[in-house]
């Protein structure tokens, strides 16, 4: 009787420990994103330093298209919600739901990248380039590096969708979907900050 109770207690303790043990892939991702946050903090510092040293009108004469930037931004923000719906599906073991929501997120992210590309084209045709001014330099550096991060997220979605299509859905793939969602939420939050600084703080 005592041994049975002891065995049961050990099993329960072992189960609790396994449930509470952090996933090292997720922990590693959070640590990596923290370093990425420091990188973007440096870009923000560069932006405000250039603004302080400009001395004149900031930003200089440019053609930022707020009416185009707002819808593109709203789509990117909405993609965080569709991404999280994919995570919920993965946690339930619903691979079809995961694929559906992640395909939607992928398309929304692609829309954002194309919208940013059009914004670049619009600005360049109106004379706002990297060598044109300090503003042009920090604008393209900050938004360009963010755009590269978004593109990296799209590639991650493609790889994840390919893996879940070509093989049986596994806990490792569910973990991968959660890790990708961390990254995607991160690039969304960074863009909200960039968008606010660039388009509203004058």
Curated annotation (Swiss-Prot):
Its main location: membrane. It is an enzyme of class 7 (translocase). Its EC number is 7.1.1.9. It is a multi-pass membrane protein. Keywords: Cell membrane, Membrane, Translocase, Transmembrane, Transmembrane helix. It comes from the Bacteria. It is found in: Cell membrane. The chain crosses the membrane at residues 30-50, 69-89, 101-121, 141-161, 178-198. It catalyses: 4 Fe(II)-[cytochrome c] + O2 + 8 H(+)(in) = 4 Fe(III)-[cytochrome c] + 2 H2O + 4 H(+)(out). GO terms for molecular function: cytochrome-c oxidase activity. GO terms for biological process: aerobic electron transport chain. Coiled coil: none annotated. SUPFAM superfamilies: Cytochrome c oxidase subunit III-like (SSF81452). GO terms for cellular component: plasma membrane. PANTHER family: CYTOCHROME BO(3) UBIQUINOL OXIDASE SUBUNIT 3, CYTOCHROME C OXIDASE SUBUNIT III. Belongs to the cytochrome c oxidase subunit 3 family. This is Probable cytochrome c oxidase subunit 3. It comes from Mycobacterium leprae (strain TN).
């Amino acid at each position: 009787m005592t041994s049975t109770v002891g065995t049961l207690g050990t099993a329960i303790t072992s189960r609790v420990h396994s449930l509470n043990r952090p996933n090292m892939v997720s922990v590693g991702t959070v640590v990596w994103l923290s370093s990425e946050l420091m990188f973007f903090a440096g870009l923000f510092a560069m932006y405000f330093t250039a603004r302080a040293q400009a001395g004149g009108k900031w930003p200089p004469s440019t053609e930022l298209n707020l009416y185009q930037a707002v819808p593109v931004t709203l789509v990117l923000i909405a993609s965080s919600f569709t991404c999280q719906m994919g995570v919920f599906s993965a946690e339930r073991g619903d691979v079809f739901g995961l694929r559906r929501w992640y395909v939607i997120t992928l398309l929304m992210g692609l829309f954002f990248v194309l919208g940013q590309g059009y914004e670049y084209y619009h600005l360049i045709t109106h004379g706002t380039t990297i060598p044109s001014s300090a503003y042009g330099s920090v604008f393209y550096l900050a938004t360009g590096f963010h755009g590269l991060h978004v593109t990296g997220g799209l590639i991650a979605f493609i790889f994840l969708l390919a893996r879940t299509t070509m093989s049986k859905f596994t806990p490792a793939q569910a973990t991968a979907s959660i890790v990708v969602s961390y990254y995607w939420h991160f690039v969304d939050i960074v863009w909200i900050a960039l968008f606010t600084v660039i388009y509203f703080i004058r």
